[in-house]
C-alpha cells in the first residue's frame, strides 16, 4: 500500500504505476498519490463516478489509467479515452499471480488499438496477466505497448531475472 510506495520512492526515479483493485477506490487515491505513485490505474466498477475519480487523480498531477477486467467491454470507457494516459487490459481475472493468459483478450486489444488510431488518441495499451514467452509477441502484435510479466520474469530459467527480461526485450 502507500507505506511501501513511500518507502521505495526515495530509492528510485523509476515510475511507480499502481493498479488499485480496491473499492471504493476514491478513498485511496489521495494516499497513493501523496506516497509517490506516478500513475494511478483504477477500475470503472470501483468508483461511483469515473470522471470524478479521473479528475481527482489529475488534481495530484498524476497520470491516469483505467483497467478493464477480461469481461469488461471497451465501450464502458470509450467516452474517457481522451482523458487517460493508459488503458490496462487484464488478461486474467484479478486476484492472484500465475494464472493462464485468456487469449480472448487479444481481440479486445486489437479493438482498442483500432479505436485509438481511428480517434488519433495518445494513451498506452497495457496488458497484465499470464504474459509469458509464448504469448508476448502476439500481445504486442495485437497492439499493446506495455506488458506486465511477473511470474515469467521471476520463475522461468530458474529465476534468472536478467536473462528473462533480456529475452522479453529481444522479442
Language model regions located:
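Structural motif corresponding to alpha-helix initiation and N-cap regions
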Residues: 1-2, 22-26, 47-51, 71-74, ...
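Charged helix-capping and loop-helix junction motifs
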Residues: 1-6, 101-108, 163-164
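Structural motif
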Residues: 19, 23, 43, 67, ...
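C-terminal helical cap(s) of enzyme catalytic domains, especially alpha/beta-barrels
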Residues: 57, 140, 154-171
Amino acid at each position: 500500500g502507500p507505506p511501501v510506495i513511500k518507502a521505495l520512492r526515495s530509492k528510485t526515479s523509476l515510475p511507480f504505476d499502481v493498479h488499485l483493485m480496491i473499492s471504493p477506490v476514491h478513498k485511496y487515491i489521495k494516499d497513493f498519490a501523496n506516497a509517490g505513485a506516478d500513475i494511478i490505474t483504477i477500475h470503472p466498477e470501483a468508483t461511483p463516478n469515473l470522471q470524478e475519480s479521473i479528475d481527482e487523480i489529475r488534481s495530484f498531477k498524476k497520470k491516469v489509467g483505467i483497467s478493464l477486467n477480461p469481461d469488461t467491454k471497451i465501450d464502458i470507457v470509450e467516452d474517457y479515452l481522451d482523458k487517460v494516459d493508459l488503458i490496462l487490459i487484464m488478461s486474467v481475472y484479478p486476484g492472484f499471480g500465475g494464472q493462464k493468459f485468456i487469449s480472448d483478450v487479444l481481440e479486445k486489444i486489437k479493438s482498442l488499438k483500432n479505436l485509438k488510431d481511428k480517434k488519433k488518441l495518445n494513451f498506452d495499451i497495457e496488458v497484465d496477466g499470464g504474459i509469458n514467452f509464448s504469448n508476448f509477441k502476439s500481445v504486442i502484435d495485437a497492439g499493446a505497448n506495455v506488458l506486465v510479466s511477473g511470474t515469467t520474469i521471476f520463475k522461468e530459467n530458474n529465476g534468472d531475472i536478467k536473462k528473462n527480461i533480456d529475452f522479453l526485450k529481444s522479442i
